């Protein structure tokens, strides 16, 4: 499960403009990194150009999956992840990032912006945060916590069963104790009454 | 906001725009004129006419203004003209803002009306999902910006409120309040339209499921009938299948795919939510089991308690018995000692006196 890039684009009429992007290319060898980055930028632009407004789509490219979300106001986001990464989390991330972006960056700057001029720095944080979808996505987080709770509860059940066995032992032992004490009392009384 | 606005009004021009805009644009104007009844003198310029294309009655504002001016000059002479001019300029600025907001409001109302018409359409094949989505988005943005503008207007009124007269202030407050109430009613309408839309979507899905499941259930039936039963029945079932397939024209299936693509994300969200829900239900049942088991163990614990208590009683009773016995034994020993003493004494006497 890995995210490779997260980019925000503006879907212009003929071409898509890259507004801001964040990359995580640490898994590639040092010499490939720049070309990989370039390739990812190109792919993102191409995908945004080919997908319609207000649509979500997932495109498979070799073993990578590109999740794209174009809002109806032409702002688009692309996430490139490996095929294991859950698409729902990717779309949640896109929605969140685009919302944030549209709040922080003025609408007028969208068609003319470039990575150098746009002042929005949240992408890298989001990218590193969403590397682990279990932590970042609230729904998966809740799910994971619930699973944990379930395991804990199962453990509790087991210990409760053990406790039940021990209690049964205690019951039998206390019964033996009761009969023995009764016998003790009887012999003591016999001792007393005989002479 | 500005480009959106243009686009929206252009879009709605041919539709319901005229019918609604008349009433909507009029309403701020009527609010202005009604509230200005109490303040005719200091706010002559507040009665700037609404755009002529939307006015249905005759525009007599100019006459009224001139009458006002003549009245004013007759009453106060020249000395009051300067502050009045200043106030008038402020006032006109305020009126301009108010009018702009009113216009925007009416535009948004028109869009909302269009959305309502689109959303209330029940047909399965003529569903303009994209348009509706876009309109919804636009209206949402419009409402937001209107909210912002009204807040600005309020700030403006507050800033200028201290300088201008009481009447002017109440007048502007009335305008702001009326604009706000318009906006509130519009957002209510918007909400109800959205509700209608979701309801429609639900119904459509139900119908689609009915039609798309039908052929699947008819398929296994057909071969059976062809094999043994009368041929007419088989043909009949096939005919019904044909009918069912006809419903799934390429157009429909294409639409289905499109909608499915759009829905996949929502579907996956719903699935996850369902997962979470089922896990929570499971957890609940586990907790119940736990409670049940703990309750069961309470009985065994009570039994242990009783046993231990009984043993304690028995042991205490035995202890007291043994104590008693011990006491009796010790008292017996003294007796024996006494007897022995007496015997020894007698023995000594016997030995001394008889030997």
Swiss-Prot record, chain B:
Residues 355 are vesicular. GO terms for molecular function: SNAP receptor activity. InterPro entries: SNARE, Syntaxin, Syntaxin-5_N, Syntaxin/epimorphin_CS, T_SNARE_dom. A motif (IxM motif) lies at residues 245-247. It comes from Mus musculus. It is found in: Endoplasmic reticulum-Golgi intermediate compartment membrane; Golgi apparatus membrane. It comes from the Eukaryota. The gene is Stx5. Residues 1-333 are cytoplasmic. Mediates endoplasmic reticulum to Golgi transport. Together with p115/USO1 and GM130/GOLGA2, involved in vesicle tethering and fusion at the cis-Golgi membrane to maintain the stacked and inter-connected structure of the Golgi apparatus. This is Syntaxin-5. The chain crosses the membrane at residues 334-354. Part of a ternary complex containing STX5A, NSFL1C and VCP. Part of a unique SNARE complex composed of the Golgi SNAREs GOSR1, GOSR2, YKT6 and VTI1A. Component of a SNARE complex consisting of STX5, YKT6, GOSR1 and BET1L. Interacts with BET1L. Interacts with BET1. Interacts with COG4. Interacts with GM130/GOLGA2. Interacts (via IxM motif) with SEC24C and SEC24D; mediates STX5 packaging into COPII-coated vesicles. Interacts with VLDLR; this interaction mediates VLDLR translocation from the endoplasmic reticulum to the plasma membrane. Residues 263-325 form the t-SNARE coiled-coil homology domain. It holds the Pfam family Syntaxin-5_N.
């Amino acid at each position: 499960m890995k995210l490779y890039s997260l980019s925000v684009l503006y879907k212009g009429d003929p071409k898509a403009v890259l507004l801001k992007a964040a990359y995580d290319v640490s898994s590639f060898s040092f010499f490939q990194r720049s070309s990989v980055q370039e390739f990812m930028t190109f792919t993102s632009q191409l995908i945004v150009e080919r997908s319609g407004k207000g649509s979500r789509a997932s495109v498979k490219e070799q073993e990578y999956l590109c999740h794209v979300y174009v809002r109806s106001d032409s702002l688009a986001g692309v996430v490139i992840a490996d095929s294991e990464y859950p698409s729902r989390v990717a779309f949640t991330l896109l929605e969140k990032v685009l919302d944030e972006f549209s709040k922080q960056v003025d609408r007028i700057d969208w068609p003319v912006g470039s990575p150098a001029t746009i002042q929005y720095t949240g992408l890298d944080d989001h990218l590193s945060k969403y590397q682990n979808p279990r932590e970042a996505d609230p729904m998966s987080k809740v799910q994971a916590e619930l699973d944990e709770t379930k395991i804990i509860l199962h453990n509790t059940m087991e210990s409760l069963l053990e406790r039940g066995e021990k209690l049964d032992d205690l019951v039998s032992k206390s019964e033996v104790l009761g009969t023995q004490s009764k016998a003790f009392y009887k012999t003591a009384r016999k001792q007393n009454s005989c002479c | 906001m500005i480009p959106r606005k243009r686009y929206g009004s252009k879009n709605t021009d041919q539709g319901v725009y005229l019918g609604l805009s008349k009433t909507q644009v009029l309403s701020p104007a009527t609010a202005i004129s009604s509230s200005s009844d109490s303040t005719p003198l200091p706010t002559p310029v507040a009665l700037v006419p609404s755009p002529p294309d939307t006015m249905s009655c005759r525009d007599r504002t100019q006459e009224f203004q001139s009458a006002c001016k003549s009245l004013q000059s007759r009453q106060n002479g020249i000395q009051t003209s300067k502050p009045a001019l200043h106030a008038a300029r402020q006032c006109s600025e305020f009126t301009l803002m108010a009018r702009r907001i009113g216009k925007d409001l009416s535009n948004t109302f028109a869009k909302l009306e269009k959305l309502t018409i689109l959303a209330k359409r029940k047909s399965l094949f003529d569903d303009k999902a994209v348009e509706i989505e876009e309109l919804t988005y636009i209206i949402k943005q419009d409402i937001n910006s209107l909210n912002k503008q009204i807040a600005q207007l309020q700030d403006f009124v507050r800033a200028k409120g201290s300088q201008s007269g009481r009447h002017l202030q109440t007048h502007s407050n009335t305008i702001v309040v009326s604009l706000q109430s318009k906006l509130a009613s519009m957002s209510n309408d918007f909400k109800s339209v959205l509700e209608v839309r979701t309801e429609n979507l639900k119904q459509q899905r139900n119908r689609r499921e009915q039609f798309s499941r039908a052929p699947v259930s008819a398929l296994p039936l057909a071969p059976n009938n062809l094999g043994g039963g009368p041929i007419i029945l088989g043909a009949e079932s096939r005919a019904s299948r044909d009918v069912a397939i006809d419903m799934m024209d390429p157009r429909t299936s294409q639409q289905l795919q499109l909608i499915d693509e759009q829905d996949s994300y929502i579907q996956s969200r719903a699935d996850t939510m369902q997962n979470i829900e089922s896990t929570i239900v499971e957890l609940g049942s586990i907790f119940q089991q736990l409670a049940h088991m703990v309750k069961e163990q309470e009985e065994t614990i009570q039994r242990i308690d009783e046993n231990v208590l009984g043993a304690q009683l028995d042991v205490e009773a035995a202890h007291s018995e043994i104590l008693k016995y011990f006491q009796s034994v010790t008292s017996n020993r003294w007796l024996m000692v006494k007897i022995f003493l007496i015997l020894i004494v007698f023995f000594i006497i016997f030995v001394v006196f008889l030997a």
